[in-house]
C-alpha cells in the first residue's frame, strides 16, 4: 500500500546570505490538511525560511532539501514553485496601479489551475462565496491591486487569493500583523476554509498566538537563531505567550530580553 508523501518536507536545511548563516539545520514535515505554526522573535530566521521555500534568489542554500509532495524544489525558479503549488502571502504586498483585482484573480487562477478553472459559473460562485466569507464587497473587484488598500484589506486580499488558487502549500508570513480582533477572526475563517479537509497544507509564520486562537495549529515550532529548538501542540503557543522565548535559548548562548505579549506588534 502506497503512502502519499508529505505536502512539505524540509531536511537539514542550512542557508544564508552573503556567507552569513541564517538557517542552521531545519527539519520540518507537514501533511495534507495540516496547519503548522512557526514562531520566534524578530531575527530568528522565520521570514528567511519562507523566502527560501519560495525560491528568493537573495538566499543561498548550502545544505539540505525542500520537497513538495516528494519532489525537491530547490532547483526550481520562484514562478515554477508557484505553478507547482507553493503560495506565499507577503508581509507587505506591493501595489500594482492599473491592474484590476478581478482580472488579477482570473489570471492567477488560470496560471495555476488552468484556463477552465478561471471562467464559467463555477468560478463566479466560488469567487462570490469566498468574498462573502471574507466580508469583501463586490466593488472590490474593480479596484487596483493593493492600491490604496488598508492593512486589513491587503490581508483579506491575500487570503482571497489563497481560497481561489487552492495551492498545495500556503506560507502565510505575519498574516495577523496590523489586524484588529475582528480582522483576525475573518482572516482565520478564510484560512480554515481553504486548508481544513483539503489536500493543501499551511505554514503560519507569526510572533504571537492571537491568530492561533482561531486557527488551531496541528503543530507549533519555535525557531531561535536559525534552529527549531522545540515543537509541540497548540498549547506551546500559549506557553510562549506567557513565558516568552528566553527559556528556550540553548544554554551557553546569549539571551536577548524579549517578552511575548498579546498586544505587542
What are these regions (language model features)?
Residues 8-10, 23-25:
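Conserved structural motif at the start of ABC-family nucleotide-binding domains
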Residues 20-21, 80:
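Short coil-to-beta microelement around the adenine-binding A-loop and adjacent beta1/P-loop entry
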Residues 39-41:
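The feature captures the beta-strand-to-loop junction immediately N-terminal to the Walker
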Residues 65-81, 146:
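ABC ATPase NBD Q-loop/coupling interface
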Residues 94-168:
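ABC-family P-loop ATPase nucleotide-binding domains
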Residues 174-175, 182:
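Walker B catalytic motif
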Residues 219, 223, 227-250:
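Conserved beta-strand-loop-alpha-helix hinge in the C-terminal portion
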Amino acid at each position: 500500500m502506497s503512502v502519499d508523501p508529505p505536502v512539505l518536507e524540509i531536511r537539514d536545511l542550512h542557508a544564508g546570505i552573503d556567507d552569513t548563516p541564517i538557517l542552521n539545520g531545519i527539519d520540518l514535515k507537514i501533511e495534507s490538511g495540516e496547519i503548522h505554526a512557526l514562531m520566534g522573535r524578530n531575527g530568528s530566521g522565520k521570514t528567511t525560511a519562507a523566502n527560501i521555500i519560495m525560491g528568493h534568489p537573495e538566499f543561498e542554500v548550502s545544505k539540505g532539501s525542500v520537497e513538495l509532495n516528494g519532489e525537491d524544489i530547490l532547483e526550481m525558479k520562484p514562478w515554477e514553485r508557484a505553478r507547482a503549488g507553493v503560495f506565499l502571502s507577503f508581509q507587505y504586498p506591493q501595489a500594482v496601479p492599473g491592474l484590476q483585482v478581478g482580472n488579477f484573480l482570473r489570471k492567477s487562477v488560470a496560471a495555476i489551475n488552468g484556463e477552465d478553472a478561471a471562467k464559467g459559473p463555477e468560478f463566479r460562485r466560488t469567487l462570490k462565496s469566498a468574498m462573502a466569507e471574507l466580508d469583501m464587497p463586490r466593488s472590490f473587484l474593480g479596484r487596483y491591486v493593493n492600491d490604496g488598500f488598508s492593512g486589513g484589506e491587503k490581508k483579506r486580499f491575500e487570503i482571497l487569493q489563497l481560497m481561489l488558487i487552492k495551492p498545495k502549500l500556503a506560507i502565510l508570513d505575519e498574516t495577523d500583523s496590523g489586524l484588529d480582533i475582528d480582522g483576525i477572526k475573518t482572516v482565520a475563517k478564510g484560512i480554515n476554509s481553504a486548508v481544513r479537509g483539503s489536500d493543501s497544507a499551511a505554514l503560519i509564520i507569526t510572533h504571537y498566538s492571537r491568530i492561533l486562537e482561531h486557527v488551531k495549529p496541528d503543530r507549533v515550532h519555535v525557531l531561535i537563531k536559525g534552529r527549531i529548538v522545540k515543537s509541540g501542540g497548540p498549547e506551546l503557543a500559549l506557553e510562549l505567550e506567557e513565558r516568552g522565548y528566553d527559556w528556550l535559548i540553548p544554554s551557553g548562548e546569549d539571551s536577548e530580553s524579549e517578552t511575548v505579549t498579546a498586544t505587542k506588534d
